[in-house]
Design a protein with these regions (language model features):
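Hydrophobic alpha-helical membrane segments of integral membrane proteins
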Residues: 1, 81-88, 105-109
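Hydrophobic core segments of alpha-helical transmembrane domains in multi-pass membrane transport
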Residues: 1-4, 32-38, 68-75, 147-162
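Proteins with a high burden of low-complexity, intrinsically disordered sequence enriched in S/T/G/P/A and R
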Residues: 2-3, 15-23, 141, 157-161
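Small-residue-rich segments of transmembrane alpha-helices in multi-pass membrane proteins
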Residues: 2-4, 27, 65-66, 114-124
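Short glycine-rich loop/turn motifs that provide flexible caps or phosphate-binding loops at active sites
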Residues: 3-4, 43, 133
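Short loop/turn hinge sites at secondary-structure boundaries
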Residues: 4-6, 170
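Membrane-embedded alpha-helical segments and adjacent helix-loop junctions characteristic
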Residues: 7-97
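Membrane-core helix-loop-helix motifs of multi-pass transport proteins
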Residues: 94-170
Length: 170
């Protein structure tokens, strides 16, 4: 930009400072959420939740699919896909194998659930959109919260539908 004659060295410094000041709160929120949910995972919080949920469904295929959705929704509260897969897949894949369910169904349900939770204010897509719009991520999230609630209902419905398909498959 400098060598092309668009900006001077002084302007580049101002642009960098402006960029950091506008994205700083977003970055801080993201770092906090990753650290917090990482600590909660290491502390075994999700193991307790998964154990309690699986006691409810036992060998019900539709129930396992719904629990997969709920676990993915809880696991994706941090907005990070990698951590969600580290929670959902190790917990649910043995159950799916034991019940002769397809691993693709596990992934499909998890990804649908994760897509809905990507609207959380600390998730990457919402933070980027808020930064571009020049508003706080929480303010943006409040406007899309009803859409997210509908998305959660649709994710649960998709889990039930996938469970019915798996049940018919045998």
């Amino acid at each position: 930009l400098v060598f092309g004659g668009y900006y001077s060295w002084e302007n580049i410094g101002k642009l960098i400072k402006s960029g950091f000041s506008s994205t700083g709160p977003t970055a801080a929120l993201f770092v906090f959420s990753v650290l917090y949910f990482g600590i909660m995972t290491d502390a075994g919080m999700f193991d307790v939740i998964i154990g309690k949920l699986m006691l409810l469904v036992k060998d019900n295929v539709i129930g396992v699919c719904v629990m997969t959705c709920i676990i993915a929704l809880i696991g994706h509260l941090d907005g990070g896909g990698a951590s969600t897969f580290c929670i959902v897949v190790p917990a649910m894949l043995p159950v799916y194998k034991k019940m002769h369910m397809r691993p693709a169904t596990l992934l499909r349900i998890a990804v649908i659930s994760m897509g809905v939770l990507n609207l959380m204010p600390w998730a990457g897509p919402t933070m980027r959109a808020a930064t571009v719009l020049g508003i706080e991520a929480g303010s943006l999230w409040q406007t899309i919260l009803p859409i997210q609630a509908c998305g959660i209902v649709l994710a649960l419905a998709a889990a039930v539908l996938n469970g019915i398909i798996e049940q018919k498959r045998g």
